[in-house]
Amino acid sequence: MSEIALRLQDVHVAYGNSQQPVLSGFSMSVRKGEIACLLGASGCGKTTVLRAVAGFERLQCGEIYVSERRIAGPGVHLPPEKRHVGMVFQEYALFPHLTAQQNVAFGLRRMPREAQQARVTELLKMVELHSHANHYPHELSGGQQQRIALARALAPHPEILLLDEPFSSLDKRTRERLGNEVRDILRAAGQTALLVTHSEHEAQLMADHIGFVKMGQYQLKKAAHHSQG
């Protein structure tokens, strides 16, 4: 049986002084190397799951573990930079004044320069944008920007990669193509990932398993039916 890479146990999250929690008794797990997906309507709490795992939201109760290391729970709230978690956002969040390779290198500033450059080159080749290394974000298409954002998130070798509706701003044809590309990149890297989407087609395209989120709770898990060939 493969190792559990991410585990949420009885997680409760509420915003501000709200008496109604966004997440209520939320529990789930993701195995190492698996691409899991949370599927649900807007406002169901699925993005809050990512924010809680990333360290952007504090838990009212419950626990979160990454590779059996507790990162959140009673008396514990590791800051985002110490969680070994990467995140790809809807809006890419690239730095406009940095080139593609500088964006990818941003989280590697403590790495020796030679090793940093080798890692950046490896990732730019992986996302097939090595020839665009010196391009600025405004010189790249939406799909290319998202691949650079993916490379940047993968650069520091995160234990878990979180993807929050990563293709929602793209047209249908580009979403389909990029979904296939990102899935293949994650598999090639052996990367454990948790994707959030409201699109069942996108979930089926990318994920090994799909969990449904309703009213802040994890409802059901099923295997996706996409071909891995």
Regions found by a protein language model. Name each.
Residues 155-159:
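A short, proline-enriched helix->beta-strand linker immediately N-terminal to the Walker B motif
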Residues 190-198:
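Conserved H-loop
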Residues 136-140, 144-146:
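Conserved ABC ATPase signature
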Residues 69-72, 114-132, 183-184:
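Conserved ABC ATPase "signature" region
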Residues 161-165:
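Catalytic Walker B motif of ABC-type/P-loop ATPase nucleotide-binding domains
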Residues 70-86, 110, 117:
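ABC ATPase NBD coupling module
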Residues 98-105:
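Short coil-to-helix segment of the ABC ATPase nucleotide-binding domain corresponding to the Q-loop/switch region
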